[in-house]
A protein has these predicted regions:
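Catalytic Walker B motif of ABC-type/P-loop ATPase nucleotide-binding domains
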Residues: 154-158
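Helix-to-loop junction immediately C-terminal to a conserved catalytic motif
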Residues: 49
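Conserved ABC ATPase signature
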Residues: 129-136
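Conserved ABC ATPase "signature" region
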Residues: 94, 98-101, 106-125
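Conserved structural motif at the start of ABC-family nucleotide-binding domains
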Residues: 3-5, 18
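Helical segment within the ABC ATPase nucleotide-binding domain
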Residues: 168-180
Length: 232
């Protein structure tokens, strides 16, 4: 299912953090969401997954009402992903599989857990407590959790922040693999990451979309980003 957002606005207190956002994303696209801190990237993602509600623009015509069309099945990895660190990895995933799926059989629950563990490369860590894991492996747990419902849309907010170079490449490889089967939207501060993983880039600054182009049409992403964000 395609994603369509029309005339999305959002205020937090007196601050207008998203301003008339219009965005359409086709099936199977991997979209990199770029922007400075506070640009509105995380707010947009939280509205897409239903954590926050969007708003109509003030004083706009009837034909400019806010519209949000997204798949029902969405996996979300927030930037600050709270994990139950006292639980073992396998136990943790089994807990969330039980909450998020309609499968009645404990056997099918267990099989899904094992499939997720294998898919994200947690086999050797499955019997460790989540709190014992490195940040890279904790991100794998978060990705497995986001994939429980085999979502049509995967939304990842800063999925590689704070990872060392080896962990970074491992997580990028996982995201590339997951992007072969679904639409992915990821936010990042790393321009090279967008070049490597994304088919399209959307740059947001001060709550507005400044650039929305296929990555193949951008000759110099660094320069495009600087111009879009007035960053000298």
């Amino acid at each position: 299912m395609a994603i369509n957002i029309f005339h999305l606005n959002k205020h937090i207190g007196k601050q207008h953090v998203l301003k008339d956002i219009c965005l359409s994303i086709g099936d199977g696209e991997v979209v990199g969401l770029l922007g400075p801190n506070g640009a509105g990237k995380s707010t947009l993602m939280k509205i897409m997954v239903g954590v926050w509600e969007g708003e109509n623009g003030k004083g706009k015509g009837e034909n400019e009402n806010f519209v949000l069309q997204v798949p029902k099945s969405i996996g979300f990895l927030p930037e600050q992903n709270p994990l139950y660190e006292d639980m073992y990895v396998r136990e943790y995933l089994r807990f969330f599989v039980g909450i998020r799926t309609n499968r009645q059989s404990p056997i099918s629950h267990s099989q899904l857990v094992e499939d997720l563990i294998t898919r994200v490369g947690l086999t050797a860590e499955a019997n460790k407590r989540v709190g014992q894991l490195s940040k890279g492996y904790k991100q794998r747990v978060g990705l497995a959790q986001a994939m429980i419902s085999n979502p049509e849309l995967l939304i990842l907010d800063e999925p590689t922040t704070g990872l060392d170079p080896n962990q970074l490449e491992d997580i990028r490889a996982l995201i590339r693999e997951m992007g072969k089967e679904r639409t992915v939207i990821l936010s990042t501060h790393i321009l090279q990451e967008v070049k490597q993983m994304c088919s399209r880039v959307v740059i947001i600054d001060h709550g507005e979309i400044k650039v929305d182009k296929p990555i193949a049409e951008i000759d110099n992403l660094e320069e495009t980003f600087k111009q879009a964000t007035n960053n000298e």
